[in-house]
Design a protein with these regions (language model features):
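Short beta-alpha connecting loops at secondary-structure transitions
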Residues: 21-25, 78-79, 288-308, 330-345, ...
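Alpha-helical transition-metal enzyme core signature, strongest for iron centers
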Residues: 37, 87-90, 101, 137-144, ...
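Glycine-rich cofactor-pocket loops
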Residues: 149-171, 280-297, 330-337, 362-382
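A conserved active-site cap/scaffold subdomain adjacent to cofactor or substrate pockets
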Residues: 244-279, 288-349
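Active/binding-pocket-proximal capping segment
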Residues: 281, 404-411
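Long, amphipathic alpha-helical stalk/connector segments used for oligomerization, subunit docking
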Residues: 312-398, 404
Length: 484
């Protein structure tokens, strides 16, 4: 730590991965500004922008070459000096660029407004950030699918209201988590595919400045918009904007990221509950400490952390929506400070959550003996309806048998609540005259109560996960080492 006094953002210093951290860093942001200024100047030159005489090219190749030579050598200290004086970040960087590229000073930002660089840069960074999220999502889906395949046949106790319900399998439960993330992947892919460039729209979105530069040539202004977009890697531009692109786009993207964190929180919470039941544990390092006081503790701290980070991201769509709602007329500056916080942190937080998921799901420890014990405590109750039908088939009285089962069930439950280690309902029914000749043991085979759970896992993997794996084969078998 070089300076322990200033606050640092834990998303950057502890949780998010380096690619996402660098994506939202100052170098990438302002280098993209310079690339946007170059793209605009190139497009204006290619479309024949002329000087006041209507003949001489307004932009020459030497100026463009100079801009290309200074895309990344940004003097941030000098830019900070300019901003303290000008109170305007875009103008500060225009002056900073002009000092190292004096030939090009007069053509930088020609016809543009600040949102030409700020908004278009945000769109570029968000699209790349969505790609990073997509890639990690594929890794999570792949890892959970492998876990579901491995444990698809292991019976476990299902819960509704966190009370014992019917049986499912460990793999089927993982398939539920996996499918949620597949839905998130589709939403992220949709957002990437629908993201448009703001383009060159001018101060209020009318393109008046560019129409003036091109002497009233509407077609050239339209081509300028499209050409700049293509140079920056976009196929489509927003058809209309105010000074900014619609902030609903931000809300849609942040909501998609929150959707990923929503699924992660569900998965993480389930893992924490299962850790309490001692059925599944997250990875635990050889020298990891669970508590400074209680040396025996083994807490699901990674799942807890991912839930904590997920909740943070889940709160951000409301801020994005409020920003979109308060964009007065063509634009206010209400959005600026909030977006500087919300957009990077939504991506950093989501990246951190997915890193944790990759790490946790790659090392889950399943405890079949504990799971079987829990199944054994409840399975006798589940078997009672089958036993009742079997006894009736042998000539028993349905109502009388029902009363026998009720009486023995409550007695066995009372014993468990008083400290008994095993459910005695099976033994009670086996020795009751009312169930003579009924094969009680056969009724206690867990496989009889799984329904189609193993088959459902196979179908999910072959019909839903397999296409994802095929499309993103280069992203399979991911892992991630956490800093803390």
């Amino acid at each position: 730590m070089t300076d322990p006094l200033p606050y640092d953002n834990p998303l950057v210093t502890r949780y998010a991965g380096r690619p996402m951290v660098e994506l939202w860093g100052p170098q990438r942001k302002h280098a993209t500004w310079r690339r946007l200024w170059l793209a605009l100047a190139e497009a204006e030159h290619e479309l024949g922008l002329t000087a006041d005489d209507g003949i001489t090219p307004r932009i020459n190749p030497e100026q463009l070459a100079e801009l290309r030579a200074h895309l990344d050598d940004i003097d941030f200290d000098r830019a900070a000096e300019h901003e303290r004086r000008l109170r305007h970040d875009v103008m500060a960087h225009i002056h900073t660029l002009g000092e190292v590229a004096p030939l090009s000073r007069s053509i930088v930002h020609l016809g543009a407004t600040s949102c030409y660089v700020t908004d278009n840069t945000d769109l570029i960074l968000m699209r790349e950030g969505l790609g990073l999220v997509r890639d990690r999502l594929v890794g999570v889906i792949d890892g959970l699918a492998r876990f579901a395949e491995q444990w698809k046949d292991l019976p476990c106790l299902g819960y509704t209201h966190f009370q014992p319900a019917q049986l499912t399998t460990v793999g089927k439960r993982a398939a539920l988590w996996c499918y949620d993330f597949v839905l998130d992947l589709h939403e992220i892919e949709h957002r990437i595919g629908r993201l448009r460039f703001r383009g060159a729209k001018g101060t209020t979105g009318t393109q008046a400045s560019f129409l003036s530069l091109f002497r009233g040539d509407h077609e050239k202004v339209r081509k300028l918009d499209q050409l700049v977009a293509r140079k920056m890697g976009f196929d489509e531009v927003e058809p209309v904007t105010g000074q900014t692109y619609s902030r609903k786009v931000d809300t849609q993207i942040v909501t998609a990221l929150a959707g990923v964190c929503e699924s992660a929180h569900k998965c993480g919470t389930d893992l924490r509950l299962l850790a309490h039941e001692q059925e599944i544990d997250e990875p635990f390092e050889a020298e990891q400490v669970g508590s400074s006081a209680m040396a025996y503790k083994r807490n699901p701290m990674r799942a807890e952390r991912l839930c904590s980070l997920a909740r943070f991201v889940l709160g951000l769509p409301a801020v994005a929506a409020q920003t979109a709602a308060t964009q007065w007329l063509e634009r206010t500056l209400d959005d600026s400070a909030a977006r500087r916080l919300v957009l990077p942190q939504a991506f950093l937080g989501t990246d951190a959550v997915l890193r944790l998921l990759l790490n946790v799901t790659a090392g889950l420890e399943v405890h079949p003996a504990v799971i079987a014990r829990h199944v054994g405590q409840v399975l006798p109750y589940m078997a009672t309806e089958n036993l009742l039908m079997a006894a009736v088939a042998k000539g028993g009285d349905r109502q009388a048998l029902h009363e026998v089962i009720r009486r023995h069930s409550h007695a066995a439950t009372a014993e468990l609540k008083e400290g008994a280690s095993e459910n005695t309902l099976t033994q009670r029914l086996q020795t009751d005259p009312a169930f003579v000749g009924v094969d009680v043991t056969a009724a206690l085979d867990p496989a009889r109560y799984l329904g189609r759970a193993p088959q459902q896992v196979k179908e999910l993997l072959s019909e839903v996960v397999a296409p994802v794996r095929s499309q993103y084969a280069h992203l399979l078998n991911q892992s991630d080492e956490l800093a803390v």
